From Swiss-Prot:
Belongs to the LysR transcriptional regulatory family. It comes from the Bacteria. It comes from Rhizobium meliloti (Ensifer meliloti). This is Octopine catabolism/uptake operon regulatory protein OccR. InterPro entries: LysR_subst-bd (IPR005119), OccR_PBP2 (IPR037415), Tscrpt_reg_HTH_LysR (IPR000847), WH-like_DNA-bd_sf (IPR036388), WH_DNA-bd_sf (IPR036390). The gene is occR. Keywords: Activator, DNA-binding, Transcription, Transcription regulation.
Amino acid sequence: MNLRQVEAFRAVMLTGQMTAAAELMLVTQPAISRLIKDFERATKLQLFERRGNHIIPTQEAKTLWEEVDRAFVGLNHIGNLAADIGRQAAGTLRIAAMPALANGFLPRFLAQFLHKPKLQVSLMGLPSSMVMEAVASGRADIGYADGPSERQGFLIETRSLPAMVAVPMGHRLAGLDRITPQEPGGERIIKQETGTLFAMRVEVAIGSILRRPSLEVSLSHTALSLVREAAGIAIIDPTAAIEFKDSIALRPFSIFIDAGFLEVRSANGAPSTVVDRFATEFSSFHDALMAQSGLIS
């Protein structure tokens, strides 16, 4: 028994005629007849009764057909799945991201990326250190984090962005085109907790103004929410700030403080067209939305 014989049997059962089955398989009618005879010999079953120009499936043929049809449905499913994977329409994608991205930017992008219904995606919002661990352990295919760009065992792409100053709507500083370290005066500064690379960069660049009355928070979104409620001002990463751009004022800072992020993959990870496409499209989406919002040029 071979697959071609099974295909011939299926074609005859589907069409009910040898001639139509031959057309379906793009072979001659004698070739179909020969394949059916060989299949009957291999199975030791009489599958069809010949009545003139007509063939009638036997009960044995009907019983066998149920299994053959199930098998071909399974093969078709495998074929369709392989085609979907080739078109990057199916597969799995596990993303780990720091909260500044996981709480706003990535959901925006995923809403349009997930138009492929067979793509299984998980998004984990984690501190940057845990993002790196998730990628290293294989729990995430790609990660977005803050941290040093030189790390062994990772493939890292850096995305540099200038920090901005977030102030309440109608605040005196909102009227400025650019804010210098001296201009906050006695304003309450909302700063991110010590320990993150971004917080360290801010401390190094403008440590003197951080000695003024301040609030300390762990998340960019918390700082931005406090700014919106006029509890103070904050030096913030624009990726998080975009979610608040209609409820606060964002102004460039005169000193460049890198508020970018890293795209991280494992150096030992298997290549994936789905991950490659996600990374490329997210990068384009991020840059386009930031430029459209006027937060970067």
